[in-house]
């Protein structure tokens, strides 16, 4: 809200369906590609600061590429390169999957729904096939993921028109009403972005202390653990010292050590942990955001979805009707992803009006 020309809080929408007001002495706008939309709620006029850039990855069966290490390949006729990364080792020197990415293209479509289109798939596969001896086709693509980078828009005199050439530096701004906005940056500089944004908020508050992120360990990073079993290696690698919580779940119910999705390394206890410790509130949260199941093997994940839904339903208080709704939403998301891969970027944007 705005009171005495100062923003004093936000109206929040939380799952499943509720809105509530939150008061605060300082509001930080760290909303990525939506940052300009949020600024518009605070300021009557402001320049657009965001230039969205889309990046996509594809997943294919490892046998189609057979790389035993992560490699970087050039993109023909483009000043870019792609990573080709093997994933899920089988223990005999081979892997289950290889994922390839990422792209970097201007994006003019709906920021709420960036999808991997036929153009994206063709771009990645053309680059891959120029560097491998096998022929990888669209039929081999079993998973995709896409997202938008909130790049800082360059000044009008910038020479290059490519998003790949834009700076990945971040920018922190404060509005006349005291809203701190942080834009730009990238995943690997998230701590520095947070530090600069919090330090700016501290100035507004008149506080002398600065952000402490430099001295804070990551979640689960309280000491190295020597692992012995395959299960230990997986859970310790994913959760660090927090793996003890998941091992306790398995001790109380050994069935939670079973695989969550066929062919993927995730266990049923991870779905439970996602709900109880990682704020997962939907089936899609568990299968797409807390684990990467849907991203790596959409078909297998869709097949496993009913059982996963049944597993987490008691933890979230879902009745049969809500379970059906969650499952229908997830299946629809998978279908929309399938459909997007069959159309060009232009056709996809046109379909959104």
Where are these regions (language model features)?
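Single conserved hydrophobic/aromatic residue that forms the stacking wall/gate
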Residues: 1-13
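Structured loop/turn residues at beta-strand edges in well-structured enzyme cores
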Residues: 8-10, 22, 281
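Residues that flank catalytic or metal-binding motifs in active/ligand-binding sites
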Residues: 11, 54-56, 80, 168, ...
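Core beta-strand elements of the Rossmann-like FAD/NAD(P) dinucleotide-binding domain
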Residues: 17-26
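C-terminal accessory subdomains/tails of enzymes that are appended
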Residues: 31-33, 44-46, 60-66, 74-77, ...
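Glycine-rich beta-alpha-beta "Rossmann" dinucleotide-binding loop(s) and their flanking helix/strand
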Residues: 37-58
